[in-house]
Amino acid sequence: MDTHIIEEGLVKIEVPDFEKVSAKAPVFYNPVMEMNRDISVAVINQYRKEVDHDISICDAFGGTGIRGARYSKEIHGVEKVVVGDVNPLAVEISKKNMQLNNISNVEVQKNDANILLQSNKGLFDVVDIDPFGTPAMFTQSTAANIRPGGLICISATDTSALCGTYHDPCLRKYGAKPLKTEYCHENGIRILIAFISRNLAVNQKYLHVLFSHSTEHYMRVYAIVKRGGKKTNKALDNIGFIAHCPNCLHRETTYGFAPKIPHTCPECGGEYDVAGPLWLGKIWDKEFIYNTMELVKNLNLNKKDDLMSLFEKCYMEADGPVTFYDIHKICKKLKISSPKINDVMDEIRNRGYFISRTHFKLTGMRTDMPLDELKQLILDIKEDKLGPEK
């Protein structure tokens, strides 16, 4: 097998030559996920700083070992990293890569992710689940075996299911109905978080989301796991449904597992589409993001600029309402061309409403301004009724 050396972060890794990224490759390595790994290094570093003790990390899908190697080299206060993979070739390459980087605190195991977690119950402070596809079948093992106070880092690449392109796979994997809307990637993350939360609840555990994002072809959630029956029950109150009107774009949220969901839009009389159950609570911790951005300034990351841009956008939208509006979608409904998004945002801000861009969509705005007022504002800007001289 032909190989070559790549450099990422502070490590050098030997990887197999391949024509394209595929789950069928002998050993999986995806260069597109470098930013994913950069974010993970940053978030886990900040987590380690806040817990203020040495940590143990489980990378349950080792591949070439690049994630485990970077965690060892680039995260301060790592006592041990356990890298697992079911592929014997991946295990062999991972071990070579640890030697290549003179790493002694990484243990590489040939093991299924679920078995790896079950055989190390309560031993890991951080569990990283980054499979090719859905993490659904590994979430219960993660929930049952993560140490209380630990950090879970979970990726999903089956975005076609979570975003509503294919409904049945989402129902089958996550027990939720997705919805193909302009904010479908946000819905997808909220479905994923609700699914994780329900799995944790079985073990009287609940989550506090630190950071989440949708980038390229994947979604990623970072959350602290805590324990307690009453607080778990309270955390489940954050799960509910979104009712969306495809006719006028109005939407509303309803909390609970079996709520009375309205069928008709109160604004236009159109029929609602419904998504859920999904997480309606916070999907970002603003203080944690700020502290992580400060920490990133001192890290050696190839994708630092992209990472900081993502953190800044999520920081700005962290206090906003559930879902956002797409200015192009609204203008299409109004049958007008779109004004400059910054002009619209400035006027929303002048009226005292929350307003931010969103990392989910370039043309997206997160605001608590009522939709009918937002539509009229856009029309007024197009008709030049608003402005400093008016």
From Swiss-Prot:
Disulfide bonds: none annotated. Residues 4-378 form the Trm1 methyltransferase domain. It catalyses: guanosine(26) in tRNA + 2 S-adenosyl-L-methionine = N(2)-dimethylguanosine(26) in tRNA + 2 S-adenosyl-L-homocysteine + 2 H(+). Pfam families: TRM. One of its GO terms (molecular function) is tRNA (guanine(26)-N2)-dimethyltransferase activity. InterPro entries: SAM-dependent_MTases_sf, Trm1, TRM1_arc_bac, tRNA_met_Trm1_C. Gene3D superfamilies: N2,N2-dimethylguanosine tRNA methyltransferase, C-terminal domain, Vaccinia Virus protein VP39. Zn(2+) binds at C245, C248, C265, C268. Its EC number is 2.1.1.216. One of its GO terms (biological process) is tRNA N2-guanine methylation. S-adenosyl-L-methionine binds at R37, R67, D85, D112, A113. It is an enzyme of class 2 (transferase). Keywords: Metal-binding, Methyltransferase, RNA-binding, S-adenosyl-L-methionine, Transferase, tRNA processing, tRNA-binding, Zinc. HAMAP family: tRNA_dimethyltr_TRM1. Dimethylates a single guanine residue at position 26 of a number of tRNAs using S-adenosyl-L-methionine as donor of the methyl groups. Belongs to the class I-like SAM-binding methyltransferase superfamily. Trm1 family. This is tRNA (guanine(26)-N(2))-dimethyltransferase.
